Curated annotation (Swiss-Prot):
Top-level taxon of origin: Eukaryota
This protein's name: Putative protein SCAMPER
Location within or outside the cell: Sarcoplasmic reticulum; Sarcoplasmic reticulum membrane
Biological role stated in the UniProt entry: Putative sphingolipid-gated calcium channel.
One cellular component (GO) term of this entry: sarcoplasmic reticulum membrane
Keywords assigned: Membrane, Sarcoplasmic reticulum, Transmembrane, Transmembrane helix
Lineage, top ranks: Eukaryota, Metazoa, Chordata, Craniata, Vertebrata
Assembly, per entry: Homodimer.
Amino acid sequence: MLKVSRVSSEGLISLSITEAPDLKIRDPKIEKLYLPVFYLNAHIYLNALSTLLNSHCGENCFHGYEQLQNATFPVWRNIFIYINRVRNIKRQGGGGGVSGKGEMKQCFLS
């Protein structure tokens, strides 16, 4: 199961694995999973997320970002997710910066 732990204003849902002993991800060092979430006019993301959430909690369960907080739902086979691997946090003169890498990976359920 994935648990929604945060929804950012930029439209990313931060997910954490809660119970997924059979979840196999290619990189074992992954710390956080990110799904690309729609801006409300990006229908492909809206439809994908609505379908995913409705499969867990029934029709019409998506009504806004606030209802995604602490939601959990199963991971589907072959769903593409963003894997954000933040390796180093470095402070630079005049401000802070995060050195990390976000990339598309494919996640498989056994």
